Amino acid sequence: MIINGKELALSLKQEMAANVATFTEKYGRVPHLVVILVGEDPGSVSYVTGKAKASEEVGIKNTTIRREATITEEELLGIIDELNADDTVDGILVQLPLPKHIDSDKVIAAISAEKDVDGFHPMNVANLWLKQPCTLPCTPKGIIKLLKRADVEIAGKDVVVVGRSNIVGLPVSKLLLNENATVTIAHSRTKDLKEVTRRADILVVAIGRPKFVTADMVKPGAVVIDVGVNRDPETKKLCGDVDFAAIEPIASAITPVPGGVGPMTITCLMENTIECFLRKMEK
């Protein structure tokens, strides 16, 4: 079975659009997301365009602030301070990566935790691990939604997460633990990686290496979630971290690239913006 993230994202956005219409009537305004784009990195520009399109689809106001790559860290922090103080702004997102002269961690920490729609603020990260209410990071949240909508049982399953980034690997491991899975985190220093991945009932791969996971690394009948977005060195087409063509016949379910996890990430960003808006309005 191919887990279609595009279809699920579409149905979730339709639900959200109906909810936003109701909230607008109740509170007199729509949720407002501000995205800050520094420089002209083609990947970043594409992501920001996608976020603006998704905002429009669900009825969220989207403002994109564009700045040259030469902006100073101090100037960027000044923009964030202004947005933190602006009551008409519900969510703030700084598109990563940032130019080398700007400290990304400092910028993320400067965003108000209440407006941090990416779920990267240290307060949100701490609350995730403490199982306290918080804004969840979009990709891990989207992965759990995909698994549940595909009726994949998580509790009691052996899950292997390949990758240990703060953005995907670590937070998705915690969310899977919260769902009562037995989680193993594998990475570049893991010995006998193939032996580890072949134990997985659910395999989540987030390492950013094209077609790294091959068919002999996957247990027949496993569920495979491919988080990678890469260019195939040979065909130059988009591909994931797993060899989809070779693994799809042996997996019980698999996400494609594109059209799997990606659409869910943006949809969960919309959901996070609405949640930040509601928390503020219901105070």
Q: Where do the language-model regions lie?
A:
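Rossmann-fold NAD(P)-binding glycine/threonine-rich loop
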Residues: D105-H121, V125, G228-M281
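Short beta-strand elements in bilobed, periplasmic/extracellular small-molecule ligand-binding domains
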Residues: S55-A69, V183-I185
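Short beta-strand segments enriched in small/hydrophobic residues
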Residues: P31-G39
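Anion-binding alpha/beta catalytic cores of soluble intermediary-metabolism enzymes, centered on
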Residues: V94-I154
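Short glycine-rich anion-binding loops that position phosphate/pyrophosphate groups of nucleotides
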Residues: V94-H101, R209-K211, N230-D232, G260-P263
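Glycine-rich phosphate/diphosphate-binding loop of Rossmann-like nucleotide-binding domains
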Residues: V38-A52, C134-V223, V227, D232, ...
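Positively charged, low-complexity intrinsically disordered leader regions
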Residues: M1-G28
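Short, well-structured alpha-helical segments in soluble
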Residues: E75-D87
